Regions:
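Feature of extramembrane
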Residues: 1-359, 513-749, 767-770, 907-918
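Membrane-embedded transmembrane helical bundles of large multi-pass transporters/channels
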Residues: 1-44, 54, 144, 188, ...
Length: 920
C-alpha cells in the first residue's frame, strides 16, 4: 500500500500539471453527486432501530400520524377572559382557521372528529348542549308540550302532538361548530356563564325529566300514534343525555398555560387556537417533508397576516412545527456559512504566520476545501448506490472538523519539505539563501522526499483513523454511523490530496523568495531540550501522569448526559421563541404521545381496559389535556350518526352486540370515523395524549413509570392485551439517555480498533508479533490517558455529553493517534540517522522538528474549532470548547508522555542498526 501512495507522490512531482488535471476532473465529476445526499434535520435521523421506534413507525403508517399543529398564539392580560370581546376575538381566530381552504383540504381530525381545538368552539358547544340558561326556553316549551299531550283527550291529541313535534324542533342537534357559528357568536357576560361552567352545570336532570315524560306518554291509550311522534324526540333527548358527560371545561382549559389550570379564567395567557393538518409528503404530492414544511410555513404566514388584519391585534402570532423546521434550518444554514468562513479566515491567518507565504497558505486551504467537496460528493454517490447515509444536525461540525484536520496535514507536509530544503543546503552549501534559490530538480527531490517521509506517518495515522471511524457503523445510533463514515471519507481525501495535489502545486508554483532561515525553525531551543531530557526520567513522567490522571478519573465518574432539546435551537429566531413558549407554558410535546393497545379492542374487556388506561393517563400529573382514543371518538360521533348510536345503545354482556359494532366500524362508513384510532382489523387502537417532554431526563423517567403502570393494567385485565407507549418525544428522550452508552461504545470501539491497527502495523514493520504488540500497546496508552483527561475535565468543569460531544472521545483518539504516529515515526527516523547518539538527542531533535510541526498543527486545529464558540447553538459551542481542550491534551501527551515510554524500543532499534553496521 505504501508503495502505491509513494508512487503517486513521485508521479505528482514528475508530472505535476497532469496530476492537477486528473485531480480536478476527479473532484468535479464527484462533487455533483452531493445533490443526492439525504439531509434530514428532523429527530428521525437520530432514531435507533429498536422496538419503540418500530412501534412509532407502525402507528404513523397505520394512522397517518405525520401531522403538524398550526396554532394562533394570542397574548392576553389577566382578567381578559371575563370580557366578551376576548371571546369574540378567539372565535374570529378559530373561524379564520376553519375557513382556510388549504387547511380544510389537509385537515386531520386529531380532536375526536374535528381538526380544530379552541376555547371559543368549546364554549359554543357548552352553551348549545349543556348550559341550563341557554336551554331554559326550549326545555320549558317542550315540557309544556309533553304535559299538554299527557292531558289530551281524543279530540285534542292530534293538535297537541303537532305542537309537541313543533316544540321538538328547538332541541339542539349535536354538530361541529362551523366558521359561521363562530363569527355569529355574541357571548353574554362571561362573568355569568363561566361561573356556571365551574359549577359543572348541565342538563342531565332536565333531560331525565323530559325523557321520563316522553316514556310515560306511550304507556296509555293511543300509544302507537303518540310513539310515532315521541320516538324521534326521545332519540334527540338520548343523544343530548350522552353529551352531558363531555368535559367542555377541560377542553377550554387545555388551550391555556398548564400552570393556570387551577384558576383558568384569571390567566394572563397566552391562549392557543389549534388546527391540525396532515404533513405526509405523499398526501401533498411531493417526495420530501421539506417541501411540505415550506408549504405549511407559507400558510401560517398568510394566516398571521389575516388575523392581524381582522382583529387589529399586532401581537397575534402563528406557530407550526414546519415553521420551526424551516426557520431554524434557514438560520442554521446562514450560521454555518458564517462559521465556515470564519474558520477559513482564521486558519488562513494561522497558516500564514507559520508559512510566511500566501501561495503555500492558499495551496493548503484550497486543497482542503476541494477535499471537503469531494467528501460530500462521495457521500451523495454512496447514498445513490443504496448506502444508508443521513446528514443531520449532529453533522454540522463536519466541514469545520475537516478544515481543521486538512490544514493540519498540509502543514506537516509543507513543514517537512522546507526542512528537507534546509538539510540540502546544510549538506551541500551553495549559497542558497531563499526558497526560490533552489533549482527545480533540487526542489523536486526535497518535495518528493519530504512528502514521502511525512506520508509514512500520515498513512499509518490516516488508516488507523479511518478504520476507527468506520467502526461507528456498528453503532445502533444512525447519526453516529453516518458521522463516522463521512469523517473517514473526508480524512482519506485530505490525505490523498496532501500527498499528490499539494506537492504538484508546489512544483508548478514557484516558491516565495523567503529567507531559508525563516522558512522553518528547526533549531533546538531550551523548550525542546527540556522536553527531550524527560526521556532520562521516565519514572517521574509516569508518576506525574498517574497523579494527574487520578482526579481526572474521578471527574470522569461525575460526567453526566445533559441533552436539552432547547439547546439545539437558536432562541433569537421568533418561531423558536414561540416553540419554547408552547413547550414551557403549555407543557406540550411537539407531536402526540401514544398509548398503543393490542388485543380484542372492541369488546367488553377491551372497553374496560381502555377506560383504565384513559384514567391512568388523566390522573397522571405530567400529562396535559384530554386523552383521545377510539371510544371518545365514538361517543362524540354517535351524536351525528344514528346507526352508530343504535349500535352503541345496544352494547351489553352479549358478545354479539360488540361483534356487530366491530363489523360496522370496519365498513367504509365506519372507517371514516375509526381509521384515525383503530387499525384495519380492529386488533389495535391508539390513545393520543400530550405531556411535557422538553426535559429529556424527566421524560425518560415519565416514560419508564407510565410504561410500568400501563403494563400492570394490561396484566390485570380480563383479556389478552398488551399496552405500550410510543411517541417521538419519548424516543428522543431514549436517544438522549443512550448518548452515554454511545459515548462509551464509540470510544471503546475506536480505542480497540486503534490498538489493533497499531499492533498490526508495528508487527508488520518489526516482523515480530511480540515486539509489534508491545510497541502498539505503548503507543496506545498515552491516547487512552488523553481520553480520561478529556472526559475528566468535562466532568470536573460541569460539561455534559450531548449529541455533539458524544463523539469527543473517538475524535480525541483519532487526533491523538495522528500526533503519536508522527512523533514515533520521527523518533525512529532519528535513531536510524544516528544510532550511536543518546536517547535525549533523538527525542530533542524530534521535538524540535516534528514537535514544532505538531504544535503548529494543533494551533490551527484548535483555531478552527474555536470558531464554534460563535455558534448560537449550545451543543456546537460545547463541542468546540471541548475539542480545543482535547487537542491541547493530545499534544501534551504525545510530546511529554510518549517519548519517555517509547525510549526502550528506540534503544533496541539503535542496537540493531549498530549491529548491522559492525557486521558490514
Amino acid at each position: 500500500m505504501k508503495r502505491i501512495f509513494d508512487g503517486m507522490t513521485s508521479f505528482s512531482t514528475e508530472r505535476p500539471k497532469t496530476t492537477i488535471a486528473i485531480i480536478l476532473v476527479f473532484i468535479f465529476s464527484l462533487t455533483p453527486n452531493a445533490m443526492f445526499i439525504n439531509f434530514d434535520n428532523s429527530e428521525d435521523a437520530f432514531f435507533p432501530d429498536n422496538e419503540t421506534v418500530r412501534l412509532l413507525n407502525e402507528v404513523e403508517d397505520e394512522y397517518q400520524a405525520s401531522i403538524d399543529f398550526i396554532r394562533f398564539i394570542d397574548d392576553i392580560d389577566s382578567g381578559d377572559l371575563y370580557k366578551a370581546s376576548t371571546w369574540e376575538q378567539l372565535a374570529t381566530l378559530e373561524a379564520i382557521l376553519l375557513e382556510n381552504q388549504d387547511l380544510q383540504e389537509y385537515q386531520y381530525p386529531l380532536f375526536g372528529i374535528q381538526p380544530n381545538s379552541g376555547m371559543a368552539s368549546a364554549a359554543i358547544q357548552w352553551h348549545n348542549l349543556q348550559d341550563p340558561v341557554t336551554a331554559e326556553s326550549w326545555i320549558s316549551e317542550l315540557q309544556l308540550a309533553i304535559d299538554a299531550v299527557a292531558a289530551s283527550d281524543n279530540e285534542s291529541l292530534t293538535g297537541n302532538l303537532a305542537n309537541l313535534s313543533a316544540a321538538s324542533s328547538s332541541i339542539p342537534s349535536p354538530s361541529l361548530v362551523s366558521a359561521t357559528d363562530l363569527r355569529n357568536w355574541r357571548p353574554e357576560d362571561p362573568n355569568l356563564w363561566l361561573d356556571r361552567i365551574d359549577e359543572e352545570a348541565n342538563l342531565s336532570s332536565n333531560l331525565s325529566v323530559l325523557s321520563a315524560g316522553l316514556t310515560n306518554l306511550i304507556q296509555g291509550p293511543n300509544s302507537s300514534e303518540i310513539a310515532m311522534v315521541t320516538g324521534p324526540i326521545s332519540g334527540k333527548i338520548g343523544m343530548l343525555i350522552g353529551m352531558q358527560s363531555i368535559d367542555y371545561r377541560s377542553m377550554m382549559i387545555s388551550n391555556l398555560p398548564a400552570e393556570d389550570s387551577t384558576e383558568p379564567w384569571d390567566s394572563n395567557g397566552p391562549v392557543l387556537t389549534t388546527f391540525v393538518v396532515v404533513t405526509e409528503p405523499g398526501e401533498h404530492g411531493v417526495e420530501v417533508i421539506g417541501d411540505v414544511q415550506e408549504k405549511v410555513s407559507e400558510w401560517a404566514e398568510d394566516l398571521a397576516s389575516q388575523a392581524k388584519s381582522e382583529t387589529g391585534d399586532s401581537e397575534i402570532s402563528v406557530f407550526s412545527f414546519s415553521q420551526l423546521a424551516t426557520g431554524q434550518n434557514a438560520n442554521l444554514g446562514k450560521e454555518l456559512g458564517i462559521l465556515n468562513s470564519l474558520c477559513l479566515l482564521l486558519l488562513g491567518f494561522i497558516l500564514w504566520t507559520k508559512f510566511r507565504s500566501k501561495r503555500d497558505t492558499a495551496n493548503v486551504l484550497v486543497l482542503t476545501v476541494f477535499a471537503i467537496l469531494a467528501t460530500y460528493g462521495m457521500a451523495g454517490l454512496l447514498t445513490l448506490l443504496g448506502v444508508k447515509m443521513v446528514f443531520n444536525a449532529a453533522m454540522n461540525s463536519i466541514p469545520i472538523l475537516l478544515l481543521a484536520i486538512g490544514v493540519d496535514y498540509g502543514l506537516h507536509v509543507v513543514a517537512r519539505i522546507r526542512e528537507e530544503l534546509q538539510d540540502q543546503e546544510k549538506a551541500d552549501p551553495q549559497g542558497r539563501g531563499t526558497l526560490r534559490d533552489f533549482s527545480i530538480e533540487a526542489r523536486r527531490i526535497a518535495i518528493r522526499k519530504g512528502t514521502i517521509l511525512t506520508s509514512a506517518a500520515l498513512m499509518v495515522a490516516i488508516f488507523t483513523d479511518m478504520v476507527g471511524f468506520l467502526s461507528f457503523r456498528f453503532s445502533s445510533q444512525q447519526f453516529l454511523v453516518s458521522f463516522g463514515t463521512v469523517i473517514a471519507i473526508g480524512l482519506f481525501f485530505i490525505y490523498l490530496l496532501s500527498i499528490t495535489a499539494l506537492p504538484a502545486l508546489m512544483m508548478i508554483i514557484p516558491p516565495k523568495k523567503l529567507p531559508l532561515e525563516k522558512s522553518g525553525k528547526n533549531d533546538i531551543g531550551p523548550v525542546s531540550s527540556w522536553i527531550g531530557s524527560l526521556v532520562n526520567v521516565p519514572q517521574k513522567v509516569i508518576v506525574v501522569t498517574i497523579l494527574i490522571s487520578v482526579p481526572m478519573f474521578l471527574g470522569f465518574q461525575q460526567l453526566e448526559v445533559g441533552f436539552d432539546t432547547r439547546d439545539n435551537f437558536d432562541d433569537s429566531v421568533p418561531v423558536v421563541q414561540d416553540f419554547l413558549l408552547i413547550a414551557d407554558e403549555f407543557q406540550s410535546s411537539p407531536s402526540p404521545l401514544y398509548a398503543v393497545l393490542d388485543g380484542d379492542v372492541i369488546s367488553q374487556e377491551g372497553r374496560a381496559l381502555y377506560d383504565s388506561v384513559v384514567m391512568e393517563l388523566s390522573d397522571n400529573p405530567k400529562t396535559t389535556g384530554l386523552p383521545i382514543g377510539i371510544w371518545s371518538v365514538l361517543e362524540e360521533s354517535r351524536t351525528t350518526n344514528s346507526e352508530l348510536d343504535a349500535l352503541m345503545n345496544g352494547l351489553s354482556d352479549d358478545e354479539s352486540s360488540w361483534s356487530a359494532l366491530e363489523t360496522w366500524l370496519l365498513t367504509e362508513e365506519g372507517r371514516n370515523i375509526s381509521s384515525g384510532n383503530l387499525n384495519s382489523d380492529a386488533s389495535q387502537t391508539v390513545i393520543s395524549f400530550q405531556a411535557a417532554t422538553l426535559d429529556w431526563q424527566a421524560t425518560a423517567d415519565f416514560e419508564s413509570d407510565l410504561s410500568a403502570n400501563l403494563a400492570d393494567i394490561a396484566d390485570e385485565s380480563d383479556g389478552d392485551f398488551i399496552v405500550q407507549l410510543s411517541g417521538r418525544s419519548l424516543i428522543l428522550a431514549q436517544v438522549t439517555a443512550d448518548v452515554a452508552d454511545s459515548a462509551v461504545i464509540s470510544t471503546g470501539t475506536v480505542a480497540a480498533v486503534i490498538l489493533l491497527m497499531l499492533v498490526g502495523i508495528n508487527t508488520v514493520r518489526q516482523k515480530d508479533v511480540i515486539r509489534g504488540a508491545a510497541r502498539g500497546f505503548v503507543t496506545w496508552i498515552p491516547l487512552m490517558v488523553v481520553v480520561v483527561w478529556v472526559y475528566g475535565i468535562m466532568g470536573l468543569t460541569g460539561y455534559q455529553l450531548n449529541s455533539q460531544t458524544v463523539t469527543i472521545g473517538a475524535l480525541t483518539l483519532g487526533l491523538g493517534v495522528d500526533y503519536a504516529v508522527h512523533l514515533t515515526t520521527r523518533l525512529e527516523e532519528e535513531v536510524e540517522h544516528a544510532p550511536s547518539a543518546d536517547p535525549v538527542v533523538w527525542s530533542t531533535k524530534s521535538v524540535a522538528t516534528t514537535g514544532r510541526a505538531m504544535f503548529g498543527a494543533a494551533l490551527t486545529t484548535a483555531g478552527g474549532f474555536s470558531v464554534l464558540n460563535f455558534s448560537s447553538l449550545v451543543p456546537l459551542q460545547l463541542f468546540g470548547q471541548v475539542f480545543v481542550v482535547a487537542i491541547i491534551l493530545a499534544l501534551v501527551s504525545s510530546l511529554f508522555v510518549l517519548p519517555a515510554m517509547y525510549t526502550p524500543f528506540l534503544k533496541q532499534d539503535a542496537q540493531k542498526y549498530l549491529a548491522n553496521t559492525e557486521s558490514e
